[in-house]
Amino acid sequence: MQGSTRRMGVMTDVHRRFLQLLMTHGVLEEWDVKRLQTHCYKVHDRNATVDKLEDFINNINSVLESLYIEIKRGVTEDDGRPIYALVNLATTSISKMATDFAENELDLFRKALELIIDSETGFASSTNILNLVDQLKGKKMRKKEAEQVLQKFVQNKWLIEKEGEFTLHGRAILEMEQYIRETYPDAVKICNICHSLLIQGQSCETCGIRMHLPCVAKYFQSNAEPRCPHCNDYWPHEIPKVFDPEKERESGVLKSNKKSLRSRQH
């Protein structure tokens, strides 16, 4: 009885609007999710006390549980920013993408995904991806078309492009982790600290363990001589900066104040 009571949630218009808008965006950073939550309260229940974000999302997830859908929290691999995405637990994300992309476009994504997973850096060059166009299933695709499809994946937040190379967006990692673990068991990389799927990060040159950049930053945060957590050998890589939500919040407030100041001046 206690279990069933715990799983029952109450969806108000606030929750429904929040869910609808999150679905529209696909993925949002935590700062934007909090703003979205506040917006939904202002529209539907201005006088209500805004729930803690964690409680608010847990309430929605308890209702979505029977539909095999969940709002999942993750962090970006490059700088550790918290993100949220609506994840379909019943199907692989590639099949979920089928409503937005043609068969040959989905196959292009699979090819890109495989190159990214197999690479040491977590990136695949556009050249290497485009060289596989002739092997695609379905309708033939020219390289120029393939370039446009890759940009479509970027716009839809499935891929990130940096200097002509592609890696998985945080949304894709959140939605596809289980699929990637099952499909590429021999090539998949796992972070030694958080034990989640790792696409890009740093590795120990002695024992080979890997760590996400945000995990590296936190683990060695106050360590003058960083050493590998597994073999204790010297860690030779540059230690990235830790994402600081307080500084980010202050920055957001400053930007907001500047915008409002500019709007008053016009």
From Swiss-Prot:
Catalytic function, reaction form: S-ubiquitinyl-[E2 ubiquitin-conjugating enzyme]-L-cysteine + [acceptor protein]-L-lysine = [E2 ubiquitin-conjugating enzyme]-L-cysteine + N(6)-ubiquitinyl-[acceptor protein]-L-lysine
Please provide, in alphabetical order, the Gene Ontology terms of the cellular component aspect for this entry.
chromosome, centromeric region; chromosome, telomeric region; intracellular membrane-bounded organelle; mitotic spindle pole; nucleoplasm; nucleus; Smc5-Smc6 complex
Q: Where is this region: Interaction with NSMCE3?
A: 1-102
**UniProt modification remark:** Ubiquitinated.
Q: Enumerate the subcellular locations listed in this protein's record, separating them with semicolons.
A: Nucleus; Chromosome, Telomere
- What main location does UniProt list? nucleus
Q: Name one GO molecular function term.
A: ubiquitin protein ligase activity
The EC code for this enzyme is 2.3.2.27
Pfam families reported in the protein's UniProt record: SMC_Nse1, zf-RING-like
Zn finger limits (RING-type): 191-232
> Which Gene3D superfamilies would you find in this protein's record?
3.90.1150.220, Winged helix-like DNA-binding domain superfamily/Winged helix DNA-binding domain, Zinc/RING finger domain, C3HC4 (zinc finger)
Keyword presence, DNA damage: yes
Basic residues biased stretches: 256-266
List UniProt keywords, sorted A-Z: Chromosome, DNA damage, DNA recombination, DNA repair, Metal-binding, Nucleus, Phosphoprotein, Telomere, Transferase, Ubl conjugation, Ubl conjugation pathway, Zinc, Zinc-finger
Q: Where is this region: Disordered?
A: 246-266
Q: What class of enzyme is it?
A: transferase
UniProt record, GO biological process: chromatin looping; DNA damage response; double-strand break repair via homologous recombination; protein sumoylation; regulation of telomere maintenance
Does the record bear DNA damage in its keywords?
yes
Subunit (UniProt) = Component of the SMC5-SMC6 complex which consists at least of SMC5, SMC6, NSMCE2, NSMCE1, NSMCE4A or EID3 and NSMCE3. NSMCE1, NSMCE4A or EID3 and NSMCE3 probably form a subcomplex that bridges the head domains of the SMC5-SMC6 heterodimer. Interacts with NSMCE3. Interacts with MAGEF1.
Q: What does this protein do?
A: RING-type zinc finger-containing E3 ubiquitin ligase that assembles with melanoma antigen protein (MAGE) to catalyze the direct transfer of ubiquitin from E2 ubiquitin-conjugating enzyme to a specific substrate. Within MAGE-RING ubiquitin ligase complex, MAGE stimulates and specifies ubiquitin ligase activity likely through recruitment and/or stabilization of the E2 ubiquitin-conjugating enzyme at the E3:substrate complex. Involved in maintenance of genome integrity, DNA damage response and DNA repair.
Family membership:
Belongs to the NSE1 family.
Q: What is this protein called?
A: Non-structural maintenance of chromosomes element 1 homolog
UniProt organism field: Homo sapiens
